[in-house]
Amino acid sequence: RVPAFGTAITPGTQVTKTIDFGTTGCPLPNGNVVKGQIIITFVFNPGATSHTINYQFVDFYHNAIKYEGNKTFTRTMTTATATSPSHPIVTMNMDMTATFPNGNSYHRVGQRVREIIAGFDTPALLADNVYQVTGSWTTTFPNTTIQTSTITTPLQVKMSCMAVNKPLIVSGVIS
């Protein structure tokens, strides 16, 4: 629920917002169907250089696939230097399970760090943005096989190389 107009939230306040798609399925304009809840929590602190937002998936389904677990995003601003303006680094930690209608479950735990390394000083122009991505994750498959993936050479994503509304990875190694 949105607080009544005029109700101020003070810095340091824990905020919890629940997106409730109901229990019967909510069709989206693109044809996907969702149900369940996503609970978003964060501490309101507008002056901080770091912000963390947690997403908890509760009985959440997307096109009959059940998603359970948490994703946490932490956005931190770097300190400006003589050669680099202050820019954001976003760290995503996840511990999620996807269960398909046939009962197969996939569990993934991991971390991804995305840093904008070029283009941050031109906020109105997204095409010049370049991101560097690092991280690692472990996936457990239904047959209990475990696969660990690690970005051994940072991935570079250039927004100028967008194809079909998706930016492309132009370099880097995942092993």
What is the role of each PLM region?
Residues 1-175:
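Low-complexity, intrinsically disordered segments exposed to solvent
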